[in-house]
């Protein structure tokens, strides 16, 4: 028996556009049913099975709730090979990455919390635009290569957003 598709676990059709509230509600419903505590008095085999189901459910939920991870997952299940590390041949985006990194470094050096907040808002806007672009590409099977490029941009912005959150925490201390 194969591992069910993440979308199938939540009884959703595979696609990029998701109702995240519906996903969260369904996750909570399913999580209650497989929570390991419910199997405390069960056999060791049933406990292990519940733990595995819970872990698989958590992994599926984390993947689907993140636009970048959802995009990568969709590309993967559609048969589009997506290597983890790849040289990006996108000079415009590489330049943008360098500018963002320099700006983040300047914000760190100046300990500018207001500047960090403004930077974070701009990143959020850029992420939302990429999400919309990916969704449009995903709807057109002829644009899978463009969808992969957009997914890589989404992953970069996720990583940069994580670094911004870390900087905020350091500056708050």
From Swiss-Prot:
Gene3D superfamilies, per the entry: DnaJ domain, HscB, C-terminal domain
Gene Ontology CC entries for this record: iron-sulfur cluster transfer complex
PROSITE patterns referenced in this protein's UniProt entry, alphabetically: DNAJ_2 (PS50076)
GO biological process, one term: [2Fe-2S] cluster assembly
InterPro entries per record: DnaJ_domain, HscB, HscB_C_sf, HscB_oligo_C, J_dom_sf
SUPFAM superfamilies hit by this protein: Chaperone J-domain, HSC20 (HSCB), C-terminal oligomerisation domain
J domain boundaries: 5-77
GO MF annotation, one: protein-folding chaperone binding
Transmembrane parts of this sequence: none
UniProt keyword Cell cycle present: no
Keywords carried by this UniProt record: Chaperone
Role description: Co-chaperone involved in the maturation of iron-sulfur cluster-containing proteins. Seems to help targeting proteins to be folded toward HscA.
Homology family: Belongs to the HscB family.
Subunit structure comment from the entry: Interacts with HscA and stimulates its ATPase activity.
Name of this chain's protein: Co-chaperone protein HscB homolog
Natural source organism: Pseudomonas fluorescens (strain Pf0-1)
Phylogenetic lineage: Bacteria, Pseudomonadati, Pseudomonadota, Gammaproteobacteria, Pseudomonadales
């Amino acid at each position: 028996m194969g591992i069910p598709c993440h979308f199938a676990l939540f009884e959703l059709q595979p696609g990029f556009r998701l109702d995240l509230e519906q996903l969260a509600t369904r996750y909570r419903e399913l999580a209650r049913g497989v929570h390991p505590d419910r199997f405390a008095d069960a056999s060791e085999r049933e406990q292990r099975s519940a733990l595995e189901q819970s872990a698989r459910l958590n992994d599926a939920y984390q993947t689907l709730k993140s636009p970048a991870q959802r995009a990568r997952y969709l590309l993967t299940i559609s048969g589009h090979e997506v290597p983890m590390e790849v040289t990006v041949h996108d000079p415009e985006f590489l330049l943008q990455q360098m500018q963002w990194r320099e700006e983040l470094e300047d914000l760190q050096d100046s300990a500018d919390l207001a500047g960090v907040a403004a930077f974070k808002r701009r990143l959020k806007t850029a992420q939302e635009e990429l999400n919309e672009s990916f969704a449009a590409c995903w709807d057109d099977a002829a644009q899978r290569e463009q969808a992969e490029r957009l997914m890589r941009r989404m992953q970069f912005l996720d990583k940069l957003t994580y670094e911004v959150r870390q900087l905020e925490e350091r500056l708050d201390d």
